[in-house]
């Protein structure tokens, strides 16, 4: 059991969880930068997104973002290459040419340079609702001295 967690804020925050926002994060759609079939698919003027393979998060706010992206682009049956548990794995799979992925830009910025140099950003989020990164704690534990002291120094 963790005392605190740093996480993306879900659409619906459980009532027992306190959330203090740290930062709004940009979300980026990335593709392989090296020559490969996926790069060829996305390099045309109007890509047929329904045929492009996607690497997706298995759950969480990023998963919901890509589902919204699919709806906005009227893609009812996306080509899912893989569903993974970590954003870092998504960057590596894109760098290998497996597909494209939507993820927080900070993940890409903190990826190892050899991996980061093998991907390109296709688009940045222009959404009205930002991806909020923050600190979470159980409300019932906010009175504990260590958690209370930490919570008081947070920006919100």
Regions found by a protein language model. Give the residues of each.
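Hydrophobic hinge/microswitch elements
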Residues: 1, 8, 61-120
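Short beta-strand-centered segments that line the small-molecule binding cleft or hinge
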Residues: 1-27, 31, 39-40, 68-69, ...
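Short, well-ordered beta-strand segments
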Residues: 5, 30, 55, 101, ...
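Short secondary-structure boundary segments
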Residues: 9-10, 33, 105-107, 133
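Small-molecule pocket liners
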Residues: 17-19, 24-29, 33-35, 46, ...
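Alpha-helical segments flanking ligand/cofactor-binding loops in enzyme cores
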Residues: 20, 45-47, 91-92, 148
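A late-sequence structural motif
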Residues: 36-37, 98, 120-156
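Secondary-structure junction motif
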Residues: 37-40, 45, 52-73, 143-145, ...
